[in-house]
Amino acid sequence: MDSSNPPIHKDLRFSGEDWYGREFGAERFENCVFIDCDMTEITTVGTVFDHCEFRGVALNASVHDTSRFDNCVFSDSSLFGATLRHCKMTGSQFRATAMRPLTIEGGVWSWVNLFGADLRNINFDHLNLEESDFGEANLDKATFRGAVLQNATLRGASIEGAVFTGADLSGVQLAGLNWRKARIDGQIAMLIAESLGAIVDN
């Protein structure tokens, strides 16, 4: 395959495909729909999925390196045991999709909709999560060390035991969250106090 001219798949519908263990390179899928496909243990390297839908797709134990899932929708799917390394997930939505255990190593997850997701124990350290929606998600014991959460939504999320040390929480509505057992640093403690109406003297 000529890597300088990767294949482009547009406006296609894939239903019931058995792609177990398939390897995807620098190819591009645009406005494609994947329905009830088995993509268990697939690997993607530099693959682009743009405005694609994954409905009832098994992505268990799949590995993705420097791939992009831009503005994709995952519904009733499974990422059990998947690994995403330096992937771009901007604007993607996850609905009734199994997300754990999940390994994330770097990447951009801004504007991602994870509303109501079970994200316990997942490591989001040093990720760009700007404007992402974690509303009503279970974030117990998840870690966000050094993550960028500017203007993210955490309303109604459970954060018991979560770690936010070094995270950027500017623009986040912090009042109303139960911070019991969550790990924070001095800067975040000040933001929480100010969100509750306290006047913090420097």
Q: Which ranges hold each PLM region?
A:
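Tandem repeat scaffolds
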Residues: 1-202
